[in-house]
Amino acid sequence: MKNISLLGSTGSIGRQTVEVALANPNKIKIRALAAHKSDEVLEQQINALQPDIAVLTDKDAAARLTKRYHGKTEILAGDEGLMAAATYDGADTVLASMVGYAGLRPTLAAINCGKNIA
């Protein structure tokens, strides 16, 4: 079983990764999701995957999601939340699909924690 932290879950690569995970529940478990501000898409992903944590780096979007969502997934916000997803103990692999510089710092943090990077 691969335990994955998915950074950039609402983008094209992230959405495809979610589809693959849903099609292979005995092989892939998404433990953490992270996105910028697509709170409605992230909420759908949370409901489908039931990760341990989910992050929106846009704090306003995170506040909107927190008001609506009352499940077990912990909702985090901002860069601190993104770093938590990148270094999450429950994941052995970080799939870094964030665009540009925004993904560099969390990816480096994941490497420093010994995570596999995809």
Question: Across the structure, where does each feature detected by a protein language model lie?
Answer:
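Beta-strand-loop-alpha-helix segment that lines the small-molecule cofactor/substrate pocket
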Residues: 108-118
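Short catalytic-loop micro-motif centered on adjacent basic/acidic residues
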Residues: 29-32, 55, 94-96, 118
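Short amphipathic alpha-helical segments
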Residues: 18-19, 47, 66-68, 106-109
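N-terminal Rossmann-like dinucleotide-binding module
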Residues: 1-54
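Gly/Ser/Thr-rich beta-alpha loop segments that engage phosphate groups in nucleotides
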Residues: 12-16, 102-105, 116
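Glycine-enriched alpha-helix->loop->beta-strand junction motifs that scaffold or abut catalytic
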Residues: 49-51, 90-91, 115-116
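Glycine-rich nucleotide/cofactor/substrate-binding loop typically near the N-terminus or early
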Residues: 31-37, 42-80, 86
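Beta-loop-alpha module in the N-terminal Rossmann-like domain of NAD(P)-dependent dehydrogenases
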Residues: 77-109
